[in-house]
Amino acid sequence: MGALTIVAKYMIVAQIEVNGSVDKSDIIGALFSQTEGLLGKDMDLRELQMMGRIGRIEVEISEKNSKTKARIYIPSNLDRYETALVAALIESVERVGPYLASVKVLEIKDLREEKRRKIIERAKELVKLIEEEILPDTKEIIERLKEDVAKAEIIEYGPEKLPAGPDVDKSDSIIVVEGRADVVNLVKHGYRNVIAIEGISKGVPQTIIDLSKKKSVTVFIDGDKGGEIVLRELIKVAHIDYIARAPPGKEVEQLTAKEIAKALRNKITLEEWLAQQKAAGEKTESQMSPQQPQLTQTQPTTAEVQAPFDLSKKIEEMLGTLEAEIYDANWTLLKRLPVRELPDFLANSNDSIYAVVMDGIVTQRIVDLATKRGVKVIITARVGPLTKVPEDMKIVTFDQITQKT
């Protein structure tokens, strides 16, 4: 079917069967000639076509066994009554050339209805486009508002101008994350005591190191290898208390409120993290720091640690408990507590402490707190990465003592 010459309201679709071989021009000629004058001049096909009331007649033809079958299309700009008359008119054709023929109208299409249907379908698509891309839902608006408010609350902290929440100074504890986007996400969800290190390419910022000496520190890392690298750099120079981790493959900046709360709720102590690394077969100390603790010179052997009881039996008793015992200068037991509570105890106790025996890992933070309390002896299951140990402090491992007995 070719192009139409008018903007039609209706389309008459008819089928003609001819008992002989004819072409398109024969069929169109028969339509004009055999209907001429039947309904008067006003309904003559030629006159209607000249006035633009009907369009160009199109014929799709096929021939088989010396018979011709064709589909006829007549576009009409008449009203529905006049269009119906034209349709009935062409059914009156009985011959094409010398051959008998029959015409049957198959349908009269309302082209305006087809246009209306397409318009409605397109309108539906556009409404969906508006709903999905132009008009955000209430939840999205609230999330945008939260993020805008969070960004407005972000401050620049310290000489390095690190991105931080507004409560870093006021809070006794802080959450250390990697980047500004992490800070924005945590502040958005109500965690205002957060600060970012902004990468470790230039080392850990001094501001973070200084804060870690005064506050309880939770490092919140991404759930990938990059997060572990950041953590190891922090452990070298800062006093880390707890470690929280995003789910595997996720970054802190991507987490929902529930995911953040769960990760922080499941945080572990540095000692527990180091123990997990060992259990996983990782050589944690060699990966984390080139400054491994040296148990010579500054760490005397067990012969230099004197106690009024059998230290080997004490170690056997302590193994597997994850607890610590606190002693005064007379080796009188002052307190027994979980290793994870040891840093807080050392920071807040007014007791005169001489020795600590612990089934855990000595970290730099524990050494620093013990130094402030005047501790002279630490007997421990393991020694973590240390950067400084007082000359008058003895740090001895369980293995050193048991190997000497």
Curated annotation (Swiss-Prot):
Segments of this protein annotated with the region Disordered: 279-302
Cytoplasm listed as a keyword: no
Assigned EC number: 2.7.7.101
Catalytic reactions of this protein: ssDNA + n NTP = ssDNA/pppN(pN)n-1 hybrid + (n-1) diphosphate
Membrane-spanning segments: none
UniProt feature, compositional bias: Low complexity: 290-302
A Pfam family annotated for this UniProt entry: Toprim_4
UniProt cofactor(s): Mg(2+)
Domain of life where this protein originates: Archaea
Cofactor note: Binds two Mg(2+) per subunit.
GO biological process terms held by the UniProt record: DNA replication, synthesis of primer
Record-level Gene Ontology MF annotations: DNA-directed RNA polymerase activity; metal ion binding; poly(A) binding
List of residues binding Mg(2+) 2: D222, D224
Domain Toprim, first and last residues per copy: 172-248
CC annotations in GO: cytoplasm; DNA-directed RNA polymerase complex; exosome (RNase complex); primosome complex
UniProt keyword Protein biosynthesis, yes or no: no
Alphabetical list of SMART domains matching this protein: TOPRIM
InterPro entries attached to this UniProt entry: DnaG_primase, Primase_DnaG_arc, TOPRIM_DnaG/twinkle, TOPRIM_dom
Function per UniProt: RNA polymerase that catalyzes the synthesis of short RNA molecules used as primers for DNA polymerase during DNA replication. Also part of the exosome, which is a complex involved in RNA degradation. Acts as a poly(A)-binding protein that enhances the interaction between heteromeric, adenine-rich transcripts and the exosome.
Family note: Belongs to the archaeal DnaG primase family.
Oligomer and partners: Forms a ternary complex with MCM helicase and DNA. Component of the archaeal exosome complex.
The protein's name: DNA primase DnaG
Organism from which the protein derives: Pyrobaculum islandicum (strain DSM 4184 / JCM 9189 / GEO3)
Gene this chain is encoded by: dnaG
